[in-house]
Design a protein with these regions (language model features):
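Beta-strand elements of well-folded, non-transmembrane domains
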Residues: 45, 62-64, 144, 158
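Flexible, processing/modification-adjacent segments and terminal tails
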Residues: 22-47, 51-53, 81, 90-150, ...
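Gly/Pro-enriched, hydrophobic low-complexity segments
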Residues: 98, 121-125, 129-206
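Bacterial N-terminal signal peptides
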Residues: 4-15
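Boundary at the C-terminal end of the N-terminal hydrophobic targeting segment
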Residues: 17-21
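Amphipathic hydrophobic-ligand
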Residues: 52-58, 171-172
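An acidic-aromatic
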Residues: 59-108, 174-175
Length: 207
């Protein structure tokens, strides 16, 4: 129901069911042919009535398999960095870093989906929603939910991922709009290497 409200708020109806094959082609290309991905983003959190609760912006890097970095450039600041083995969460305002084993820390989450993805048909129920304006929408619902989110929708313009919408268990919607997208260009390993700043508290469950 919440997604239905969001679609109504966004405007026109969806394209016919004949677009299903085209939708899978877009998804397969993104997960199988895109090895690196970089973009700037604006993230907006909406409540169940589609009222904006919070807006942040930042930069995103992905290098498959398993590496990603989200840097939030808000006044509070936060970085989420995964190097394939360790996940770092840095809260600038709290001056605190959390260090955890990546495999156990993030489970089945959008970050795992976007930075891996080859198993998406095995792990997710996929629905091709079709075109709305210039954006082609695809829904992925985890087959085994761990409670972190209920549904993720990916919006493509042409073959390029431009929008991510996430519905959590509290019926809040997180909408991420991507810009300045760059695919399949080398990303330095240093982007995914995190060194805690001097003086911050480090909480770790990794040897």
């Amino acid at each position: 129901m919440r997604w239905m409200l969001l679609w109504l708020a966004m405007g026109a109806g969806l394209s016919p069911a004949c677009a299903v094959a085209d939708g899978y082609e877009r998804l397969d290309r993104f997960f199988e042919k895109v090895t690196t991905f970089k973009a700037s983003f604006i993230q907006v959190v909406l409540d169940e009535n589609l009222l904006a609760l919070e807006e942040t912006s930042g930069l995103l890097w992905i290098a498959r398999p398993g590496r990603f970095r989200w840097d939030y450039e808000s006044v509070h600041g936060q970085s989420i960095v995964a190097d394939g083995e360790v996940l770092w969460l840095y809260d600038v305002e709290l001056e605190q870093v959390t260090r955890r084993a990546q495999e156990s820390a993030i489970g089945q989450t959008p970050a795992v989906l976007l930075s891996g993805g080859q198993q998406y048909r095995k792990d997710y129920n996929v629905t091709i929603l079709g075109r709305q304006g210039a954006v082609y929408w695809i829904s992925l619902v985890p087959k085994l939910s761990d409670g972190s989110f209920a549904e993720i929708q990916l919006g493509f313009e042409g073959e390029t991922l431009r929008l991510i919408q996430l519905l959590d268990e509290l019926n809040q919607i997180t909408r991420v709009t991507l810009a300045n997208v760059v695919e399949n260009e080398p990303i330095p390993d240093s982007v995914f290497r995190f060194i805690p700043p001097t003086g911050v508290d480090v909480i770790s469950d990794v040897e």
